[in-house]
């Protein structure tokens, strides 16, 4: 903006304002006028050792696909553009289509085999699950019967304890009776074991 005003002032030399000298504030500051408070620590940077610059230099140059349409150009240059042959592009597309069709058939075949195998596995798992369920029910019945056996064993132990406490009392009572009224010695063991 300042340069435009100065050029306008030069183009109108007969103007009344042209004789006015610019104020000292509009003068550019000289290096002598600048006071440096603290010198900054700005090391001299060597661009050739910068890793980013080295990586950018390692990128290979390449030409655009359609020569003549470089960035910034709106219309192609007078150089003859290379054109693609439509028949070859069509053959390329047809080959690619055939390749995709073959890949799709292979995937569909594998998918069908996988679905069939999954159905077989589902059937096997269902059969195994029903078998295990029946076995679990059977074992639950066995566990219930074992629980009954344990209960009966506890009852028999209590009966045995009662007999063990009662037999000495019976023997004592029997010893207090007269000789003619005494009973035979009481025994829980069967007669077979007594005879042996």
Curated annotation (Swiss-Prot):
Entry-annotated residues carrying Phosphoserine: 71, 75
Membrane topology recorded in Swiss-Prot or TrEMBL: Lipid-anchor
One GO process term, biological-process aspect: organelle transport along microtubule
Entry keywords, A to Z: Lipoprotein, Lysosome, Membrane, Myristate, Phosphoprotein
Subcellular location per the Swiss-Prot or TrEMBL entry: Lysosome membrane
Pfam families: LOH1CR12
Record carries keyword Ligase: no
Organism superkingdom: Eukaryota
Lipidation positions, renumbered (N-myristoyl glycine): 2
Modification after translation: Myristoylation at Gly-2 mediates attachment to lysosome membranes.
UniProt cross-references to PANTHER family, sorted A to Z: BLOC-1-RELATED COMPLEX SUBUNIT 5
Subunit architecture: Component of the BLOC-one-related complex (BORC) which is composed of BLOC1S1, BLOC1S2, BORCS5, BORCS6, BORCS7, BORCS8, KXD1 and SNAPIN. Interacts with ARL8B, KIF5A, KLC1 and PLEKHM2; links the lysosomal BORC complex to the microtubule plus-end-directed kinesin motor.
Role: As part of the BORC complex may play a role in lysosomes movement and localization at the cell periphery. Associated with the cytosolic face of lysosomes, the BORC complex may recruit ARL8B and couple lysosomes to microtubule plus-end-directed kinesin motor. Thereby, it may indirectly play a role in cell spreading and motility.
Sequence similarity: Belongs to the BORCS5 family.
Protein name as catalogued: BLOC-1-related complex subunit 5
